[in-house]
Amino acid sequence: MCRLLVVRSQEPFDPSEHLAKFALIAKNSREYQGHGWGCAWRHGRTWQGYRNICPIWEDDHTRFPRTSLLVAHARSAFEDKDIAVENNMPFSDGERVFIFNGELRGVKIREEGRIGAEKIFNFIRRFDHGDTLGALKKAVEIIRNQTRSIRAMNIIMVKERGVYLSTYFTGDEDYFTMHYKDGPELMICSEIYPSDQGWQSIPNETVRAW
């Protein structure tokens, strides 16, 4: 399953430092994370994005400008299917940016989207009329009730400077537990940065905002 990263800072930072650490996490993951990657960053009041079908550890991380908000995703495609750059996250509608990892089978909701993650993003958007956290809670509850089997469903959605997270998994706690480190820089990642201190684990079934 995929790897997720969000970094939000009070001051602009060089994203290459975070992307290098994230690339190392993806490369060393016990599950292959090389089906492409992407990132989005805040530029003024708008989102800019980049996606590439190559593994993140083979790409150039120095191409991106300084920013105060970064969202990144390294993809491990479900059953090695639908490997195409347009299926790489982050997904964005210009207002929200979305990343996901997990595995769901027998989902009974109807929504537009090329792959399951995009359908989940569009389903959450359906309920977001200003209360993004409330929309995330409602959508996750419905999806859980309308899905035959969920191995994991970790979601991060960023809107303006708000970061909204939902985490749920039914096994493999070490792999699916999300982690965060708060301070002048907020960092949320699928794994703790190598040789870094001060991270906290996010409990399963958390839905919260920063």
State where each predicted segment sits:
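A short, Trp-centered hydrophobic/proline-enriched beta-strand micro-motif
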Residues: 38, 70-73
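Extreme N-terminus nucleophile/cap motif
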Residues: 1-54, 165-171, 186, 201-209
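Short, basic and Ser/Thr-rich N-terminal targeting/leader segments
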Residues: 33-37, 65, 84, 149-151
